[in-house]
Regions:
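C-terminal regulatory/interaction module of P-loop NTP-utilizing enzymes
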Residues: 1-324
Length: 324
């Protein structure tokens, strides 16, 4: 259904979020979509985004992976557009994303080529036709692309003070960025393109820091039915690594990494296939801290907390047990 409404744009589904409860929804760290979020317009964070969007015309949610950026952008977009799917669009930037994808490109047809409107231009034109309605563009992974090249001449005119001023796009057509178009974007502050994004948007849009949230994680683990003692040990490790992240921001771990955590087995999977690599990368030049975090993770599990039983009479120290 959504694909029919916004052809040519990569849409993102609720399955990407892994939502199922309010806490799980807040923890959704994958790219979000406009499919009935469980956080409503009355959520304080959504209200903050809406308020700032009205002042600046655009809001950037900036934070490490797993901090619910995309989900809150999606929830705010729905609220701003009163749930009308034709009034909001989602795009995801990447390293090869260009002006031709976003604003105006060419598409082949019999006998030559014709201009093809990108998602930004389409939404601009729609918003101009209905100035009393709010339209929203959500850009996921803003810092993954060369934003100056992607926005082109429009970069100047997304600024609130320059809305409604006419300018020409690549085919010579005169357009304007209307005041009723809101731009919401997400970005990872540790991406390579962050400096360019900051330079382009720091005067134009508001920015909200999205940080790892212990309270959201605690609620999420409770909703998942995790044993209280195990949950507390996970929270202790979560605090520990994010404490290190104050000096090494690349080590930040968002609460959404634990969205599927229910028991010891699921925690081991999260470590073996995700967190282990994050810790190794963040502390590849700091073996002491890396070892400390690995040891602290092992102590989440009760078996690591119990002292090794003394060998029985006649047993040879270090010899394998009968069960091995």
């Amino acid at each position: 259904m959504l694909e029919e409404l916004i052809p040519g744009v990569r849409t993102l589904t609720a399955d990407d979020l892994g939502i199922g409860t309010r806490a799980r929804a807040e923890a959704g760290h994958a790219s979000s979509a406009p499919d009935a979020p469980e956080i409503g317009a009355d959520h304080p964070r959504v209200q903050e985004i809406i308020r700032l969007a009205g002042i600046f015309g655009g809001v950037i949610l900036s934070g490490p992976p797993g901090t619910s950026k995309s989900f809150f952008a999606a929830a705010a977009a729905q609220a701003l557009a009163n749930g009308e799917k034709s009034r909001y669009r989602f795009v995801q930037f990447h390293a090869s994303y260009q002006y031709e994808d976003f604003m105006l490109g060419f598409t082949p047809e019999e006998g030559g080529f014709r201009f093809k409107e990108g998602p930004f231009l389409k939404l601009v034109l729609d918003a101009c036709e209905k100035p009393d309605a709010t339209y929203v563009l959500v850009i996921d992974e803003l810092s993954r692309a060369d934003v100056g090249r992607v926005f082109g001449e429009a970069l100047t005119y997304v600024e609130r003070s320059k809305r409604e001023l006419p300018f020409n796009i690549a085919n010579g057509r005169e357009i304007k960025v209307p005041s009723n178009l809101i731009i919401l974007a997400t970005m990872n502050p540790f991406d390579r393109g962050v400096d360019e994004v900051d330079a382009a948007f720091e005067r134009r849009f508001a920015k909200i820091s999205m940080d790892p949230n212990r309270e959201v994680l605690a609620e999420l683990l409770d909703e998942n039915g995790m044993d209280e003692a195990l949950r507390d040990r996970v929270l202790h490790w979560f605090n520990r690594i994010n404490g290190y992240a104050r000096k090494n921001p690349a080590a930040a771990v968002g609460h959404a990494y634990f969205s599927a955590a229910t028991d010891e087995e699921s925690l081991r999977d999260i470590w073996d296939y995700q967190l282990k690599y994050l810790v190794q990368r963040a502390f590849r030049r700091d073996e002491n801290t890396r070892t400390d975090l690995e040891t602290a993770w092992d102590h989440i599990f009760p078996a690591a907390l119990d002292p090794e039983p003394a060998p029985g009479p006649g047993a040879t120290p270090g010899a394998p047990s009968a069960e091995t």
